[in-house]
Amino acid sequence: MSGQLRDTTGFLYEIGLLKRYKRTGWSQVGVPLPESIADHSYRASVIASVLAAMEGADPQRAAFLALWHDSQETRITDIPHLTKNYVSAAGNEQVTGDQVAGLPAAVAEMISAAVAEYEAARTREARCARDADKLDCLLQAREYAEQGHSNVQPWIDSSLAALTTASARQIAHEAIAQNSLDWLERAKRAAARAQ
């Protein structure tokens, strides 16, 4: 087996850790089975594409940036904000560089460029992806609040304050105003009318 093929396969196994690693901040407030990092990255990618379409940016690029935004957490895990005051971790671009070392050049460049663009936050797509990260956190906090976890308001407040695009702020305010399952009731009524 070639070294690049071995390293690429190993990288794909490494990325699988994101399905098992949990978002640690939720555990701090008593959520017994918090979402995984992969759960978060998936919905953030969907949100990024929606925001980009609403903002006139490239939905595919925004979703792609969001897809890679937490890939470094296979090595540094999801470090809670309080913990960041006491420990330091390598920057995301450095971690990504270590992760992609040994991969085919085209693959390494694709991933490194996506992470660099996301971190720089200069493109509309990167801003949409970064807002998607925060908006997913807000949505998740609202869902956990509805399940009885009352200590999540700081996540809602900080996520809302961090949003930079008009579309993300509008969706956030709507998310705060409605129940997370209101869509289901609307869908049931629409299905009943269609029959």
Language model region names:
Residues 1-195:
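Active-site helical microenvironments for divalent-metal-assisted chemistry
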